[in-house]
Swiss-Prot record:
Its EC number is 6.3.5.7. Belongs to the amidase family. GatA subfamily. The active site is at K79 (charge relay system), S154 (charge relay system), S178 (acyl-ester intermediate). Allows the formation of correctly charged Gln-tRNA(Gln) through the transamidation of misacylated Glu-tRNA(Gln) in organisms which lack glutaminyl-tRNA synthetase. The reaction takes place in the presence of glutamine and ATP through an activated gamma-phospho-Glu-tRNA(Gln). GO terms for cellular component: glutamyl-tRNA(Gln) amidotransferase complex. It comes from the Bacteria. Heterotrimer of A, B and C subunits. The gene is gatA. GO terms for molecular function: ATP binding; glutaminyl-tRNA synthase (glutamine-hydrolyzing) activity. It catalyses: L-glutamyl-tRNA(Gln) + L-glutamine + ATP + H2O = L-glutaminyl-tRNA(Gln) + L-glutamate + ADP + phosphate + H(+). InterPro entries: Amidase (IPR000120), Amidase_dom (IPR023631), AS_sf (IPR036928), GatA (IPR004412). It holds the Pfam family Amidase. This is Glutamyl-tRNA(Gln) amidotransferase subunit A.
Length: 494
């Protein structure tokens, strides 16, 4: 079985037709992890025994002629900030080393209901704070297209696992681009749905008004399938919408004739790599040839989204991460004098530099004397940006931009330049600020590295995203190109 090119929906058909057993699929993916993950570092934990046991149980269901779930027998990886019962949930942080989740997140419950199987937990930036997965306190992850480069972040391990054939599908979280940016860097499809489309129950909170669980897949149909399976209302997350979930994977169409697509000029200005710009412009021409009506538009306030985002996200992080105090659970310093010292030293030793930087920033902007000048103004800017996006979505079915201003950058290239790292999210954070859905799909290659095309639409219009993405995908070959991980001519220092 060619794990690099076969899709989840094709795998399910093969299982249904008894061309392959679930156990064979599980063993093939485990062999793939053994083969390449020592180089890539996608996984923090692989549930080998549990995967094989579940696979055997599912094979028995087939032999009994039982009805198969939508994700029957499909190996799925899960970012290590989403709870899976009896598996670790470390957020790639020393603070949570050894923590085992006693329950399933809502999305994991849904995966199990549809009979998908969890292969393991993937690496990430610590507490989802980062854009390269370099902030993991546990291990370094590498881009499967070039082992000297980052996979993006914070859901870097999830993107790697799909791009490298180590999982058929993956679940991640997106607070400012953490699914779409690594999807772009690794050449896969990544969706951040509308805020409230998918329950966040069981996901460790970073920025509660920004966080959203989303999906990563090798192609649009797989992404649509996983999204429809895990979406829906959850009473344990009051932000979820009580709305019917469309059958996204069954309504895909290449026909986008007459669809109005806007091209915001602010996304094509200074800072965008010329070769990336060319790839995105060529992608826009494909959509035009497929019948879409293309028109330039303007969202002038979008340039303030990044600044507003980092103020709001840091403020929410400083509140959410206060629970990690070395007393209730998690890492506890052994060198302390009293209760206050436990708190101070446990957080100082257990949290990484980027996490501490954002906690300090968040505490600062929420403090007396600065609340009005920073946090309150950021909330006002957020509202104005949201209003502009809502207005633009009345005119267009979708708007298109690059996912990132560059392709994947080299390991350590931006680690010490915080602002340069933050700017890699400049095109993705507006979707989180506003809550609209956005998807990244492969649209080209630049110097051997994937380029991502970002498509955004109005609230709960994921079906439009999937159709525009599917139309482009069916007219091009970019989604079918896979990395050659076995090349040995690269000095990647392992």
């Amino acid at each position: 079985m060619n794990y690099m090119t076969i899709t989840a929906h094709k795998l399910k058909d093969m299982i249904k037709n008894r061309e392959i057993s679930v156990e064979e699929i599980a063993r093939t993916y485990l062999d793939r992890v053994d083969e390449v993950d020592g180089k890539l570092g996608a996984y923090l934990y692989v549930a080998s025994e549990g995967l094989l046991q579940k696979a055997k149980e599912l094979d028995k269901k087939i032999s009994r002629g039982e009805i198969l779930g939508k994700l029957f027998g499909i190996p799925i990886s899960v970012k290590d900030n989403i709870s899976v019962e009896n598996m670790q949930n470390t957020c790639a942080s020393r603070m949570l080393t050894g923590y085992i989740s006693p329950y399933d997140a809502h999305v994991v419950e849904k995966i199990k209901f549809h009979q998908g199987i969890i292969i393991g937990k993937t690496n990430m930036d610590e507490f989802a704070m980062g854009s390269s997965t370099e902030n993991s306190s546990i291990k370094l992850s590498r881009n499967p297209w070039d082992l000297n480069r980052v996979p993006g972040g914070s859901s870097g391990g999830s993107a790697i696992s799909v791009a490298a054939g180590e999982a058929a599908l993956s679940i991640g979280t997106d607070t400012g681009g953490s699914i779409r940016q690594p999807a772009s860097f690794c050449g896969v499809v990544g969706l951040k749905p509308t805020y409230g489309r998918i329950s966040r129950y069981g996901a460790v909170a970073f920025g509660s008004t920004l966080d959203q669980i989303g999906t990563i897949a090798a192609d649009v149909e797989d992404c649509a399938l996983l999204t429809e399976c895990i979406s829906g209302m959850d009473k344990r997350d009051f932000t979820t919408a009580d709305m019917e979930v469309p059958k996204y994977s069954k309504s895909l169409s290449k026909d986008i004739k007459g669809m109005r697509i806007g091209i915001p000029k602010e996304y094509f200005g200074e800072g965008l790599n010329d070769k990336v710009r060319k790839s995105v412009e060529e992608a826009i021409l494909v959509l035009k040839e497929n019948g879409a009506q293309i028109k330039e538009c303007s969202i002038p306030l979008s340039e303030y989204a990044l600044a507003a985002y980092y103020i709001i996200a840091s403020a929410e992080a400083s509140s959410n991460l206060a629970r990690f105090d070395g007393i209730r659970y998690g890492y506890r310093s052994k060198n302390f004098k009293d209760a206050v010292d436990i708190y101070f030293k446990s957080r100082s030793e257990g949290l990484g530099s980027e996490v501490k930087r954002r906690i300090v920033l968040g505490t600062y902007v929420l403090s007396e004397g600065y609340y009005d000048d920073y946090y309150k103004k950021a909330l006002k800017v957020r509202k104005l940006i949201r209003n502009q996006f809502e207005d633009i979505m009345k005119e267009f079915h979708a708007i298109i931009s690059p996912t990132c201003p560059t392709t994947a950058f080299k390991i350590d290239e931006k680690k010490e330049d915080v602002m340069a790292m933050y700017l890699s999210d400049i095109y993705t954070v507006p979707a989180n600020i506003t809550g609209i859905p956005a998807i990244s799909i492969p649209c080209g290659m630049v110097d051997g590295l994937p380029v991502g095309l970002q498509i955004m639409s109005g609230y709960f219009r994921e079906n439009i995203l999937f159709n525009v993405a599917y139309s482009f995908e069916q007219s091009t070959k970019w989604h079918s190109i896979t990395p050659d991980i076995q090349k040995e001519d690269r000095n990647y220092g392992i």
